[in-house]
Amino acid sequence: MHSHNVAKPAMYGRHWATAGAVSLLSLVFVLNGCAVGPDFVKPEADIHENWSEKDDSRVATKTAVDSQWWRAFNDPTFDKLIKLAYQQNLPLQITGLRILEARARLGIAIGRQFPQQQDIFGSATKVGVSENGANKAFLNQDFSDYQVGFDAVWELDFWGKFRRDVQAAHASLIASEADYDDALVSLTAEVALTYTVIRTLEERIELTRENVKLQEEGLKIAESRFSNGITTELDVTQARALLESTRASIPTLQSGLRQAQNALSTLLGQPPGAIQTLLDGQNGIPTAPEEVAISVPAELLRRRPDIRSAELSAAAQCARIGIAKADLYPAFSLFGEIGFQSSNNGGVQSNNAHFDNLFDASSFFYSFGPQVQWQFFNYGRIENNVRVQDARFQQLIVNYKNTVLRAAQESEDALIGFLKAQEATAFVQNSVHAAHRSVEIALVQYREGAVDYQRVLDTQRALLQEEIRLTDTRSSIATNLIALYKALGGGWELRQGQPVISESMQAEMRKRTYWGRLLPPPSPKPENLSPVPVRDIPVLKKPYW
């Protein structure tokens, strides 16, 4: 409860307080560029100028990655799935909401630049005084006290603490935007990979069924020769064993296919089975182009969202070192209080004071002036907090460098995988042609009695094995190209000009909470991807209401 039973300050005291407050406030604005703590400098990254496979004729260099790289596969179903995933994927929507959360946190940081305490207060108190208490002769035994007013305390940003807080919050905001882009890159790649798995399993099931027909033909030949007494029953049992083994692989493949379809449904924000009509038709394994155009390795530093996020997270933590260091210095504040008070607790002569004269001119009071607070004796708490923040910053610097190295590795691995899968596919295709011919020859020779049935079994097994290898290597071409585009940071441009939160979700949120101008959140812009230097942050930044 506020109590104001002291005399009003003398004139010279008011002048001193006013002059001190104005001088202190003026000094803070003059020292706008003053901020303790280190300024963030982008870490050096060890990355080569060119790819290891730069001399391969299938690799072309260009300044940017295709923003819609999946269209290179010329598969309309592919395009539809990517679009639906962008619109409906639930984890991506969560990442978009984190951008909104980060914008609100930036608003909190900006709000701290203004008076940190601004309270309207009021009270009406009835007090009964003990007749046996001290000073009872000077107080009414029963008295009332009424007061209402406004007070404020403004800690001035003398050491840049609040500007560093804004700087950290802004870096965290654009880091959350980079995280959204990274989630979008991962989503497009995951949809593409899952779709490729589905088409690969469909083809393997079809190949297995064709081999079942071929093995059924071999079984009929063995049964005919056995019934005519030409061979023993062993040929029949061997043929039947291979046939049943091949048939048994189909349910396993079908199970894997259904699981992949369910995984794709989840990526599209749909329950299992809901996207089956989209997958109808035999589009086959996505066919990748023979050549690929990619940017130089240094472009990774700009394009890969996870690298941008790592850099911005380090920038935010660098600003937090300054916030911690500011606590080592005295905090300068301005305080002020105005209000009205009416009380009859000053003795027997004050019985006429009551609520009716609360707002009389004689009931007005005020106080204001500068103040200083310094946590001088803190037993190492503040200094160790600075050390904690610095250690976290160094961790993020190392994490940034590791992210760059990992990005380079992923790109190189995917590129070499794509090129070598193409070469392997050409060899396996020749092997499949030879395996088909071997089966034909073995069956003819078996009918003629030139070879036993074991030779037929061996050629049929080899054919199935080589056809599966061909399917897998063709799939590997597509999956390695998808991995390459993901490693290069391709696909996040899909969100440009689009809201990161759907209109229906915005409407749902507005029903619960007043969001002001934070909704709808603007789409992140490429020119807003760098941390803001503290010197560019004003002492008073326009607040988010």
Predicted feature locations:
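Bacterial N-terminal signal peptides that target proteins for export
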Residues: S3-S23
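Charged, alpha-helical scaffolding/interaction elements associated with membrane systems
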Residues: Q88-N89, N228, E448
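Small/polar-residue-enriched beta-strand and adjacent coil segments characteristic
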Residues: V36-P43, S67-Q68, N74-L84, Q88, ...
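Amphipathic alpha-helical interface segments used for oligomerization, scaffolding
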Residues: R225-T231, S249-T252
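Amphipathic alpha-helical coiled-coil segments
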Residues: T95-A109, A183, L187-E210, L214-E217, ...
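Terminal intrinsically disordered/low-complexity segments used for targeting and assembly
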Residues: H2-S3, A19-A21, F29-Q87, Y146, ...
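Short, conserved phosphate-binding/catalytic loop or strand-edge motifs used
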Residues: K126, G218, E233-R240
